[in-house]
């Protein structure tokens, strides 16, 4: 029986997280959800200050849950180190909203949960979607694609490529293995009353749509599912270059064949 830890930064009550965990369990996986009580978006691989020092355990629909008031990375570590659950893969997602480029790689709590596992030597994948929390129509497609990604990742990831980052747009055209975009978004805002600063979150999807290079954000804006792979070497994180590694092209072909047969090579 394959074993998986499922986490995210949107919280343990996220519909997309529960749909993914329950779907894996229904396929015979032994699943532990290790996700925060509330929203910890933007906390990266932080382990936090542990606003609560309790981790609560319960079981629902064949899935065991570990949750507490701490970020995803801390809960993944808790499930592995304290609960003693050693997974075949750690899946972080399905996140509401994409996580694109180097900036999101170092900011996203969802990617941080996957990175925590990768640093410990476990295969891990972060999955984000264009779907937002209030939307329901795009979740079934994102779930179907995510299940194929998990099944492929547990077979293909290795010590030479232990972390996969995936972003699913609406009505995707197929998978493309690529590298993360390098552009860094700027904060925007204005001076408010009494000198306060009103800061707005920048919609960086516009930033990447003007990229000339086929990095993840650019491909996402074109309707593709960008896939970036990383090697963890003695604690250092190395994004892999698809133009130099034939293995990455093989991963792309396998993913496309599972979901988009016309776009992939048959194996």
Swiss-Prot record:
PANTHER family: 5'-NUCLEOTIDASE SURE (PTHR30457), PHOSPHATASE, PUTATIVE (AFU_ORTHOLOGUE AFUA_4G01070)-RELATED (PTHR30457:SF0). Its cofactor is a divalent metal cation. It holds the Pfam family SurE. Belongs to the SurE nucleotidase family. Nucleotidase that shows phosphatase activity on nucleoside 5'-monophosphates. Binds 1 divalent metal cation per subunit. GO terms for cellular component: cytoplasm. It catalyses: a ribonucleoside 5'-phosphate + H2O = a ribonucleoside + phosphate. Its EC number is 3.1.3.5. One of its GO terms (molecular function) is nucleotide binding. Keywords: Cytoplasm, Hydrolase, Metal-binding, Nucleotide-binding. This is 5'-nucleotidase SurE. It is an enzyme of class 3 (hydrolase). A divalent metal cation binds at residues 9-10, 41, 95. It is found in: Cytoplasm.
């Amino acid at each position: 029986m394959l074993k998986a830890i499922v986490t995210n930064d949107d919280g343990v009550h996220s519909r997309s997280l529960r749909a993914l965990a329950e779907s894996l369990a229904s396929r015979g996986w032994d699943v532990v959800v290790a996700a925060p009580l509330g929203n910890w978006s933007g906390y990266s691989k932080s382990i936090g200050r542990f606003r609560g020092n309790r981790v609560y355990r319960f079981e629902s629909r064949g899935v065991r849950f570990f949750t507490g008031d701490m970020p995803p990375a801390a809960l993944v570590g808790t499930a592995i180190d304290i609960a003693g659950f050693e997974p075949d893969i750690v899946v972080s997602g399905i996140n509401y909203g994409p996580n694109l480029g180097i900036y999101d790689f170092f900011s996203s709590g969802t990617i941080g949960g996957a990175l925590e596992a990768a640093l410990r030597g476990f295969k891990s994948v972060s999955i984000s979607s264009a779907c937002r929390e209030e939307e329901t129509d795009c979740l079934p497609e994102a779930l179907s694609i995510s299940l194929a990604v998990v099944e492929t990742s547990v077979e293909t990831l290795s010590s030479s490529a232990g972390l996969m980052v995936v972003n699913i747009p609406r009505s995707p055209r197929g998978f493309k293995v690529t590298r993360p975009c390098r552009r860094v978004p700027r904060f925007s805002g204005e001076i408010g009353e009494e000198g306060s600063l009103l800061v707005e979150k920048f919609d960086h999807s516009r930033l990447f749509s003007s990229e000339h290079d086929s990095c993840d954000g650019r491909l996402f804006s074109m309707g593709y599912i960008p896939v970036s792979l990383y090697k963890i070497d003695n604690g250092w994180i190395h994004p892999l270059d698809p133009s130099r590694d034939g293995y990455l092209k093989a991963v792309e072909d396998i993913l496309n064949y599972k979901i988009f047969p016309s776009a992939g090579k048959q194996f």
